[in-house]
């Protein structure tokens, strides 16, 4: 093999081929846009494998396997060039690729209110659902306690909502009272009240059809 390469480089005649050496199987080479296309001979067969086990006596020998594909495509020179500006393209791994895809059931944002087990309709044959082997009370206890714990975790949520609504109502009442007190203690309201009192005191006591009559003269001078 090395003698063939040296003969190609130095233009020396090729040495005589050995019968044991496999013959060349490349019949044509063509380079198109940086791609090297090689055509193989149709009569090329794969060499026998010395380490393969012989076929059993009852089976016929396998047919010689021809190479299915006779075209080999090599990458263009831009991927194999060497140099500071001609080096092969290096792909950098993104750190986000290492993140695991989280299943919705395993999410950390799931609260206790969403985990509620709905009891289905009772089975017509409850004894058939149990296994044949007898289980102790200690083994059956966790299966019965688990849905109860989940229901207890979901129960406080409505009570908390009611408490929040009551607290909101109390805050609204307090704000209304504060606004009323500020309105009564404001300077404008006090001035209006004082003016109303003064206007009432200035009014005469007798109004309407009352006629004032002068008194008789006592002295004649």
Curated annotation (Swiss-Prot):
Keywords, ordered alphabetically: Activator, Autophagy, Cytoplasm, Cytoplasmic vesicle, Nucleus, Phosphoprotein, Transcription, Transcription regulation
Segments of this protein annotated with the region Disordered:
41-68, 177-210
Its subcellular locations are:
Cytoplasm, Cytosol; Nucleus; Nucleus, PML body; Cytoplasmic vesicle, Autophagosome
Name of a matching Pfam family = DOR
Which cellular component appears as one GO term in the record?
A: PML body
Domain of life, per UniProt, equals Eukaryota
| Chain span(s) of sequence motif LIR | 26-41
The molecular function terms of the Gene Ontology recorded here are: ubiquitin binding
- Biased composition regions of type Pro residues, renumbered to the chain: 47-64
Q: Which InterPro entries match?
A: TP53INP
Point out residues bearing the modification Phosphoserine. 136
One GO biological-process annotation of the entry reads: autophagosome assembly
Q: How does it assemble?
A: Interacts with VMP1, GABARAP, GABARAPL1, GABARAPL2, MAP1LC3A, MAP1LC3B, MAP1LC3C and THRA.
Purpose of the protein: Dual regulator of transcription and autophagy. Positively regulates autophagy and is required for autophagosome formation and processing. May act as a scaffold protein that recruits MAP1LC3A, GABARAP and GABARAPL2 and brings them to the autophagosome membrane by interacting with VMP1 where, in cooperation with the BECN1-PI3-kinase class III complex, they trigger autophagosome development. Acts as a transcriptional activator of THRA.
The text the record gives for the protein's domains is: The LC3 interacting region (LIR) motif mediates interaction with GABARAP, GABARAPL1, GABARAPL2, MAP1LC3A, MAP1LC3B and MAP1LC3C.
Q: What name has this protein been given in UniProt?
A: Tumor protein p53-inducible nuclear protein 2
């Amino acid at each position: 093999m090395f003698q063939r390469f040296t003969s190609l480089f130095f233009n020396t005649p090729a040495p005589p081929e050995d019968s044991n050496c496999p013959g060349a199987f490349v019949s044509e080479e063509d380079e198109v846009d940086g791609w090297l296309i090689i055509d193989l001979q149709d009569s090329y067969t794969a060499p026998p494998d010395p380490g393969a086990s012989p076929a059993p006596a009852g089976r016929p020998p396998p047919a010689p396997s021809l190479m299915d594909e006779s075209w080999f495509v090599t990458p263009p020179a831009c991927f194999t060039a060497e140099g500071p500006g001609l080096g092969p393209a290096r792909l950098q791994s993104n750190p986000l690729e290492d993140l695991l895809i989280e299943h919705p059931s395993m999410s950390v944002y799931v609260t206790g209110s969403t985990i509620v087990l709905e009891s289905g309709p009772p089975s017509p044959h409850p004894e058939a659902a149990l296994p044949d082997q007898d289980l102790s009370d200690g083994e059956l206890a966790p299966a019965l306690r688990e849905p109860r714990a989940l229901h207890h975790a979901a129960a406080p949520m409505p009570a908390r909502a009611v408490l929040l609504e009551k607290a909101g109502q109390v805050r609204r009442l307090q704000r209304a009272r504060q606004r009323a007190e500020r309105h009564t203690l404001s300077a404008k309201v006090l001035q209006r009240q004082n003016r109303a009192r003064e206007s009432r005191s200035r009014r005469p006591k007798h109004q309407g059809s009352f006629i004032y009559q002068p008194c008789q003269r006592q002295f004649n001078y």
